[in-house]
A protein has these predicted regions:
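A short, N-terminal "cap"/entry segment at the start of jelly-roll beta-barrel domains
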Residues: 1-36, 95-140
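Short histidine-centered beta-strand/loop micro-motifs
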Residues: 41, 49-54, 71-72, 91, ...
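Short acidic-glycine-tyrosine-enriched beta hairpin
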Residues: 69-88, 173-193
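Ligand-binding loop in jelly-roll beta-barrel domains
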Residues: 73, 84-108, 189-214
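Surface-exposed interaction/gating patches
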Residues: 116-169, 174
Length: 214
């Protein structure tokens, strides 16, 4: 079953209950054709073990807790990228919340790696109050974590190739609304906005330049 498969549409989904200790999985995007995969926010209970078959590329971000991927422990803000053909066994001892993006990529992707959240390299963003940690750079797409201190305002900008945001902490804002932790926002190709934060600040996962443009 397809869900939010039309990339020309702006989508906002609240999955705040999962980040607040809920269980289960919130599907953010899926398509009828199996090769397109799906995007979800999943809460894994303590002591669970599961497998990734490796038939598609898997991107994984640890939102809460810890997960072991093929025996390697990854804590909060850690990012793993498993190329197609790379199966994995995953387990969590105390439970975790994960962002999972499983798909066949639009561009060649053969690299598999993991970045630990505690050792990410943060750099100054384009305006004061922003810190950016790059997670993956593709031919057209870019994936990063962005930390916003309270009362930060960013420049108005246009999303060439679209933008996808998952709010990890705090409250993210723009002229269209306010988005607490656990909110997923997908903005289409050539959409625009002027984001900012209030007194809470925010940390977000952001992916740009990767959506369908037709």
């Amino acid at each position: 079953m397809s869900l939010h498969a039309d990339h020309s549409q702006r989508i906002v989904i609240e999955a705040t209950a999962i980040l607040a200790g809920g269980r289960g999985e919130k599907i953010l995007e899926s398509r009828d054709a199996a090769e397109h995969g799906r995007i979800s926010l999943r809460a894994q209970p303590p002591g669970s073990t599961w497998a990734h078959a490796g038939t598609r590329l898997l991107e994984l971000l640890v939102v809460r807790g810890h997960v072991h991927v093929n025996g390697e422990e990854l804590g909060p803000s850690s990012y793993a990228r498993l190329a197609s053909g790379r199966p994995a066994t995953l387990r969590t001892e105390a439970g975790c919340v994960l962002y999972l993006n499983e798909r066949n990529p639009a561009e060649p992707a053969t690299d598999s790696f993991a970045l630990r959240g505690a050792t990410l390299k943060w750099r100054q963003g384009m305006v004061p109050g922003l810190k950016v940690a790059s997670l993956h750079e593709g031919l057209t797409g870019h994936t990063a974590l962005v930390h916003w201190v309270p009362e930060t305002r960013f420049n108005p900008h246009t999303h060439v190739g679209g933008e996808e945001i998952l709010v990890l902490d705090g409250v993210f804002r723009d002229e269209h609304g306010s988005y607490p932790a656990g909110t997923w926002i997908r903005s289409p190709h050539l959409s625009n906005h002027r984001p900012f934060t209030g007194p809470e600040g925010a940390t977000i996962l952001v992916k740009v330049g990767h959506l369908d443009v037709a």
